[in-house]
């Protein structure tokens, strides 16, 4: 005699909601990790992990490209037109978490790929000016 066991999901909507919540929590934890890495990097506690031996103009070009890519990702994904198209691919309930995931990946890439520049790029000598900044 063969016995067949079937697993029935009592409430598929609840399963989808739980999966969306788990996805969102994972995305926000990744954001926390990338933001903490960024804070440590800016504070001088984390050296650039992939610093290349390149000319200063090349390092500046890489850094500018990273900042532009980060800004473009934020700007494009924040637009209503993009969200309308994007929510045809990604469930609307996961749209914000996916935005956070993409931003976290971009921030992590910015930290990981940043190229140090020799010398001071800019400096404020005035104590009042430094306090304002």
Tell what function each PLM region has.
Residues 2-133:
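Membrane-anchoring alpha-helices and their flanking helix-loop junctions
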